[in-house]
A protein has these predicted regions:
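A generic "binding-loop/recognition-motif" signal
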Residues: 48, 59-60, 78, 94-95, ...
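Short beta-strand His + acidic residue motifs that chelate non-heme Fe in jelly-roll/DSBH
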Residues: 54, 73-74, 90, 96-103
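Short, surface-exposed secondary-structure edge patches
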Residues: 43, 63, 77-81
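Conserved short histidine dyad/triad with adjacent acidic residue
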Residues: 27-31, 42-57
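Short acidic-glycine-tyrosine-enriched beta hairpin
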Residues: 77-92
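A short hydrophobic beta-strand segment most commonly corresponding to one strand
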Residues: 89, 104-116
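A short, N-terminal "cap"/entry segment at the start of jelly-roll beta-barrel domains
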Residues: 1-38
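Glycine- and acidic-residue-biased ligand/ion/polar-headgroup-sensing regions
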Residues: 59-61, 65-71
Length: 116
C-alpha cells in the first residue's frame, strides 16, 4: 500500500492536553489501514512556544522520534532536551509532556501510540 501526503489526515489541536498554542497532527495511516495495535501513526508539529501538556498514558505507550527541531521533554518529572534523531518512550502509567521552547525553529516528531 502507498499513501500520498495529500491523502493524509491533518488535525489542528489547540491547547492539546492543556499545553500552549496548537499541535498539528498528521495521521500517516488511519485505523483500518494497518492490522497492528496502535492508536496513532503520524507526525506532530509544534511551532515555537507550543507544547503538549503533561498527561498520563493508560493502556498504551507513546514513542516519539525527533525529525526536526529541539524538544523540551518532561519524562516523569525529569526534563530532558531532545535533538534531531533522538527518541523517547512513555510507558503505560507514566507521565510526560513535550514542548518547543525555541524562538525560531519548528519541532516535528514521528509519534506512535501502541495500545495493549
Amino acid at each position: 500500500m502507498i499513501k500520498r501526503h495529500e491523502n493524509m489526515t491533518e488535525t489542528v489541536k489547540v491547547n492539546m492536553r492543556g499545553g500552549d498554542g496548537q499541535a498539528v497532527v498528521t495521521d500517516i495511516l488511519n485505523k483500518g489501514e494497518y492490522k497492528g495495535h496502535a492508536r496513532l501513526l503520524g507526525t506532530i508539529l509544534l511551532e515555537p512556544g507550543c507544547s503538549i501538556g503533561a498527561h498520563v498514558h493508560e493502556n498504551e505507550e507513546e514513542v516519539f522520534y525527533v525529525i526536526e527541531g529541539t524538544a523540551t521533554y518532561n519524562d516523569n518529572g525529569k526534563t530532558e532536551i531532545l535533538h534531531k534523531g533522538d527518541s523517547c518512550i512513555c510507558l503505560g502509567g507514566e507521565t510526560h509532556s513535550i514542548a518547543n521552547r525555541t524562538e525560531n525553529e519548528n519541532l516535528t516528531v514521528f509519534a506512535v501510540f501502541l495500545t495493549f
